[in-house]
């Protein structure tokens, strides 16, 4: 990575305003509320998966297709870690054959999201229980993901057929979260090519998806014939020049995951710059609008982006020395976001929704999942709970 990025000065806040004892009790109450919902959904879903987003508060039931199915077993693994109750492990393990079948038969696998899909379903199972079949499924997923790596452009193509001119050479900020599958595969097999591809992609994302002011494009196109940069645009943000909140959150968290696997401290500083841009554009309740350009408007919030960003901030705190000048600020803001999500966005038992974290946005432009629960929002809220309640080792 060679690009220089501006790091904004942080807006002033008063530190130590969150009552940690009170927050701890709130999080225990939240976990009780969450697990009651999970218990109902385990029965309601059977062998199906929740769709990407609720429709009028109800999860569409789907087969193991699309990019989000692993967020459900990911929630179950987190619930097992936090409660020790066997029913969550058993429910998560029931989905493992479906993920094995999906990758073996190439069912809806023409996507970079194999990292999401197999980190949270199979690597989690292997890390927590030593399940060898889950490990093999994840290794096969890494091999399939390598098929999407273009060595000339040095990127993993996000979506679609590799020969589709509309998709060729397109990388997106979300992919930073998929790279740990490749780093892990190198660690497991001793084959460096997986990690080399992941490192190359992370470098290209840092150089081209991140703008000089530390905002991010959602997507960026590279020339697959020459390797030269072409242009950036959005797919889910407000405009090509705005900053989609969830994308910025993926960046904060995702660059840190590359640091965790490579030790490249440039990734920590890049995450810091993205975090400053994000934190400086939060409304009064610390939960972002769906696009950061919409601060000061009545645009809907995206609680899922807030949960992702809070997890990323806690990962940033872990990566920094104790005496870092802004470390306490990042931790304070992660706690404030967690408090706001718990008080204002987490569904209550009597709320007419099957989801957990309300007021998320999937795709504003298509009207899909607007002001609904989204499966990744539910997952990252649980991950946030796990990070704040105990020593927790990521599945990424």
Map each language-model feature to its residues:
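Glycan-recognition and catalytic cores of secretory/periplasmic carbohydrate-active enzymes
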Residues: 1-396
């Amino acid at each position: 990575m060679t690009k220089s990025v501006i790091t904004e000065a942080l807006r002033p806040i008063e530190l130590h305003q969150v009552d940690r004892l009170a927050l701890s009790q709130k999080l225990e109450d939240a976990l009780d509320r969450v697990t009651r919902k999970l218990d109902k959904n385990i029965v309601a879903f059977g062998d199906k998966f929740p769709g990407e987003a609720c429709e009028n508060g109800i999860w569409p039931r789907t087969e193991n297709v699309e990019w989000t199915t692993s967020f459900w077993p990911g929630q179950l693994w987190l619930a097992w870690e936090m409660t020790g109750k066997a029913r969550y492990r058993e429910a998560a393990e029931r989905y493992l054959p479906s993920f094995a079948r999906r990758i073996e038969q190439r069912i809806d696998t023409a996507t970079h999201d194999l990292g999401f899909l197999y980190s949270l379903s199979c690597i989690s199972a292997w890390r927590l229980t030593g399940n060898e079949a889950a490990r093999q499924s994840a290794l096969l997923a890494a091999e399939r993901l390598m098929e999407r790596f273009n060595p000339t452009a040095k990127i993993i193509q996000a979506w679609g057929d590799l020969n589709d001119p509309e998709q060729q050479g397109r990388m997106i900020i979300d992919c930073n979260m998929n790279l740990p599958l490749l780093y892990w595969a190198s660690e497991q097999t001793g084959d460096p090519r997986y990690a080399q591809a992941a490192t190359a992609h992370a470098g290209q994302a840092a150089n081209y998806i991140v703008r000089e002011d530390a905002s991010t494009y959602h997507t960026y196109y590279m020339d697959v014939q020459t390797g030269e940069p072409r242009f950036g645009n959005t797919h889910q943000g407000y405009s090509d020049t705005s900053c989609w909140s969830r994308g910025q959150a993926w960046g904060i968290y995702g660059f840190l995951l590359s640091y965790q696997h490579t030790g490249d401290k440039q990734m920590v500083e890049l995450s810091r710059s993205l975090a400053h841009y994000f934190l400086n554009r939060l409304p009064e309740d610390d939960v972002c609008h769906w696009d950061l350009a919409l601060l000061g408007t009545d645009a809907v919030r995206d609680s899922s982006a807030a949960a992702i960003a809070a997890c990323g901030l806690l990962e940033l705190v872990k990566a920094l020395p104790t005496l870092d000048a802004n470390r306490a600020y990042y931790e304070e803001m992660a706690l404030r976001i967690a408090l706001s999500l718990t008080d204002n966005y987490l569904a209550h038992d009597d709320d007419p929704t099957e989801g957990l974290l309300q007021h998320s946005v999937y795709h504003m432009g298509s009207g899909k999942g607007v002001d609904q629960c989204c499966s990744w929002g539910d997952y990252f809220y649980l991950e946030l709970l796990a990070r704040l309640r105990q020593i927790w080792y990521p599945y990424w």
